[in-house]
């Protein structure tokens, strides 16, 4: 126990700051309502979207992009498709998992290329591991014009021989968004990571006057001990529709959370994105993106 506490404390020597599963039936009393399609003249393919965005909503997206090489062999074509999906969905901020940065697999900063394709968005890359002469990790993209007050990376503790993990954090003047990709190897290692995630939030953002969101590929289903441990500090605000597996998707492992001790939000709706007008979302990655609409 003393060794674990020492590991957790070492993660947080940082500058202080801030301080319904498978839902498809329309139901006005259910916040995870299905978007039945729209022809409004907004961003997207010819202004169309299957997921209409409510007026005044802030739309958060999480997306494991699989290093932009799962099914489309040309990286730039894959990035182009993902950027079109983000535009069609009208996301206001996106957390991204499985990004390459200047390695021999992809000699490019992938999150920077995506941000450019989105029209000059701002970005942050958080390295998880050294990989093939470069790096591999998570990222966050936010529109140009958003005021970023801090961006940083939290290295999660790793007392094992398994892959190291991290959190990529962007703090703006209105909200905090943190993207992470947790391990799946052993329950003990997963719990060590989750204790560190919870301790990071408690240490840095307890009582924060703006909402704090944590999102990404948790590699755990909703009924797992891992998600139960996260729920001691966080609320799941995204749909629990399936996000990964041979299409149609068979498991939910990608989530968006809200930190209980930060400023409150109201959830308007959420979905896993299983179809888009701009292209075949099942070919963009082996994961489906997830969004949630909130107001705060």
Predicted regions and their residues:
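Sec-dependent signal peptide recognition
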Residues: 2-7
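N-terminal, active-site-proximal structural segment of metallo-dependent hydrolase catalytic domains
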Residues: 15-117, 130-134, 195, 286, ...
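Metal-dependent phosphoester-hydrolase catalytic domains
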Residues: 30-49, 188, 202-213, 219-296
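Active-site beta-strand/loop signature of hydrolases that rely on acidic residues for catalysis
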Residues: 59-65, 82-107, 141, 177-180, ...
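Structured beta-strand-rich core segments of catalytic domains in phosphoester-bond hydrolases
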Residues: 32-37, 42-52, 99-175, 269-273
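Active-site-proximal beta-strand elements of phosphoester/diester hydrolases
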Residues: 57-70, 150-152, 169-183
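Hydrophobic core
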Residues: 9, 13-14
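Active-site environment of divalent metal-dependent phosphoester hydrolases
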Residues: 67-70, 101-106, 132-133, 185-188, ...
């Amino acid at each position: 126990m003393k060794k674990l506490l020492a590991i957790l404390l070492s993660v947080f020597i940082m500058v202080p700051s801030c301080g319904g599963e498978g839902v498809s039936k329309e139901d006005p009393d259910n916040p995870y309502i299905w978007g039945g399609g729209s022809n409004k003249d907004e961003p997207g393919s010819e202004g169309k979207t299957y997921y209409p965005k409510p007026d005044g909503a802030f739309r958060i997206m999480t997306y494991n992009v699989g290093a932009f090489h799962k099914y489309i062999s040309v990286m730039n074509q894959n990035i182009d498709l993902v950027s079109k999906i983000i535009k069609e969905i009208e996301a206001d901020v996106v957390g991204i998992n499985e990004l390459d940065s200047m390695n021999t697999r992809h000699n490019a900063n992938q999150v920077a290329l995506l941000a450019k394709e989105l029209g000059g968005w701002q970005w942050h890359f958080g390295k998880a591991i050294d990989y093939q002469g470069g790096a591999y990790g998570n990222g966050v993209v936010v529109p140009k014009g958003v005021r970023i007050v801090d961006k940083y990376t939290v290295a999660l503790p790793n007392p094992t021989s398994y892959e190291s993990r991290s959190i990529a954090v962007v703090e703006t003047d209105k909200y905090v968004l943190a993207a992470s990709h947790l391990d799946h190897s052993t329950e003990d290692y997963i719990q060590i990571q989750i204790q560190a995630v919870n301790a990071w939030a408690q240490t840095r953002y307890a009582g924060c006057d703006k909402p704090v969101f944590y999102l990404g590929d948790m590699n755990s289903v909703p009924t797992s001990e891992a998600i139960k441990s996260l729920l001691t500090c966080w609320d799941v605000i995204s749909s629990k529709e399936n996000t990964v597996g041979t299409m149609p998707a068979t498991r939910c492992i990608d989530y968006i959370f809200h930190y209980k001790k930060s400023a409150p939000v109201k959830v308007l709706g959420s979905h896993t994105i299983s179809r888009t007008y701009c292209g075949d979302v099942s070919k963009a990655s082996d994961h489906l993106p997830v969004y949630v609409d909130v107001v705060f």
